């Protein structure tokens, strides 16, 4: 009888050992082998700036799940390229207002609110003029880029002309150059109004144009200029920052920004 009891106890012990809870390593392996169906991909160079204020490169379709988590109300679009139809449709379905500031210049000082209807009407009205100007624009863009890089080197050798050269370059209407003062003012007017929040500020790569607006915002927050430059260069990659961008940030007149302190975000007060 004793041997039968001991054998039954062995069988019971074996059964209990096979039904024990999985170890930590087993749980980790199970998570790796079975990833969730929902994949969240942030836009390039995404980073929080302040509470409910974000910056990034130009969002695409694969970033929609991530953007849904932000509950955005406004997107400040600084890129010279217009948003795609798919992205406009997503923003329309999500009730996100796109402020298209990428092409503001001295002749067109008003921002555009991008919608699918607006984009279709613009493409129809501009199709003929774009065909006529496409050849001349493609030739001039290369020359402008070369002059832009050459001017940066000249500024290093002759610091006495820094500010004057900066203003002359900023006022150029070439969309490949840095933003002008008008664009920055419009962007900051939107940022200092908490009724527009949450806000995403974006441009093509989330580097120079976005960095210019953020740098001027930091000046509005009375940051030290060294800290402003360090934050700007953090997003520029291996090529480093542009001298003209940093000079524009330094010379921007923050008194141009219209601040209603009753509607200003708490972090600005």
UniProtKB/Swiss-Prot annotation:
Domain Tyrosine-protein phosphatase residue range list: 45-261
Class in the EC hierarchy, top level: hydrolase
The answer to whether keyword Hydrolase applies is: yes
> What's in the keyword line of the UniProt record?
Cytoplasm, Hydrolase, Protein phosphatase, Stress response
UniProt catalytic activity: O-phospho-L-tyrosyl-[protein] + H2O = L-tyrosyl-[protein] + phosphate
- InterPro entries xrefs: Prot-tyrosine_phosphatase-like, Siw14-like, TYR_PHOSPHATASE_DUAL_dom
What residue spans carry the region label Disordered? Answer: 1-25, 112-151
Single annotated GO MF: phosphatase activity
Which stretches are tagged as biased composition: Low complexity? 120-142
> In its UniProt entry, what is this protein called?
Putative tyrosine-protein phosphatase OCA1
Organism, per UniProt? Candida albicans (strain SC5314 / ATCC MYA-2876)
């Amino acid at each position: 009888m004793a041997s039968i009891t001991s054998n039954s106890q062995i069988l019971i012990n074996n059964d209990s050992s096979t039904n024990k809870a999985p170890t930590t390593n087993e749980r980790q392996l199970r998570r790796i082998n079975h990833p969730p169906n929902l994949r969240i991909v942030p836009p390039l160079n995404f980073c929080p700036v302040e509470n409910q204020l974000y910056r990034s490169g130009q969002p695409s379709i694969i970033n929609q799940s991530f953007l849904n988590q932000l509950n955005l109300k406004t997107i400040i679009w600084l890129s010279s390229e217009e948003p795609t139809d798919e992205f406009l449709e997503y923003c329309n379905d999500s009730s996100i207002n796109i402020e298209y500031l990428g092409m503001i210049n001295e002749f067109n000082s008003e921002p555009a609110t991008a919608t699918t209807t607006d984009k279709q009407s613009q493409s129809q009205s501009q199709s003929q003029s774009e065909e006529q100007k496409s050849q001349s624009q493609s030739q001039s863009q290369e020359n402008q880029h070369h002059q832009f890089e050459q001017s940066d080197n000249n500024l290093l050798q002759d610091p006495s002309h820094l500010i004057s050269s900066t203003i002359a370059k900023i006022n150029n209407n070439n969309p490949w150059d840095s933003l002008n003062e008008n664009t920055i003012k419009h962007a900051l007017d939107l940022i200092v109004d908490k009724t527009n929040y949450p806000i995403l500020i974006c441009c093509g790569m989330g580097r120079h144009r976005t960095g210019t607006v953020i740098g001027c915002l930091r000046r509005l927050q009375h940051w030290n200029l060294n800290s402003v430059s360090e934050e700007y260069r953090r997003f520029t990659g291996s090529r480093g920052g542009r001298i003209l961008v940093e000079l524009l940030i330094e010379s921007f007149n923050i008194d141009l920004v219209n601040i209603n302190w009753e509607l200003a975000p708490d972090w600005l007060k």
